[in-house]
């Protein structure tokens, strides 16, 4: 299964950061720095776990979407992309 939405989402994240609009959640999150973004990724990961244990499949999907979005912002803030993660996964499969 190909999930091209990640490429689109990465492009939107880059665009929102480049625009520098303080009304944009993405821009504000990015501007808050790696430490804050990393904490947010941790919070979202916990929310996925809680949803898996107590809230049902729909909530797991919703919280997973939040986690993936925040992870993409974190990767961007470190000068990385999902492509870098994909390369590592491909390397591990060899």
Swiss-Prot record:
Keyword Nucleotidyltransferase on entry: no
Gene3D superfamilies: MazG-like (1.10.287.1080)
Catalytic EC class: hydrolase
SUPFAM superfamilies with a match to the protein in the record: all-alpha NTP pyrophosphatases
Protein's GO biological process: L-histidine biosynthetic process
Keyword Hydrolase: yes
Any single GO CC term annotated in Swiss-Prot or TrEMBL for this entry: cytoplasm
Molecular function in Gene Ontology: ATP binding; phosphoribosyl-ATP diphosphatase activity
Main location: cytoplasm
Reaction catalyzed: 1-(5-phospho-beta-D-ribosyl)-ATP + H2O = 1-(5-phospho-beta-D-ribosyl)-5'-AMP + diphosphate + H(+)
Family to which this protein belongs: Belongs to the PRA-PH family.
Protein known as: Phosphoribosyl-ATP pyrophosphatase
Organism in which the protein naturally occurs: Pyrobaculum aerophilum (strain ATCC 51768 / DSM 7523 / JCM 9630 / CIP 104966 / NBRC 100827 / IM2)
Gene: hisE
């Amino acid at each position: 299964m190909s999930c091209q939405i990640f490429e689109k989402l990465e492009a939107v994240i880059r665009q929102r950061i480049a625009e520098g609009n303080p009304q944009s959640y993405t821009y504000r999150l990015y501007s808050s720095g790696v430490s804050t973004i990393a904490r947010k990724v941790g919070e979202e990961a916990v929310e996925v776990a809680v949803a898996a244990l107590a809230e049902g499949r729909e909530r797991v999907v919703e919280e997973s979407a939040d986690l993936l979005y925040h992870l993409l912002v974190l990767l961007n803030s470190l000068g990385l992309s999902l492509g870098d993660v994909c390369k590592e996964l491909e390397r591990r499969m060899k």
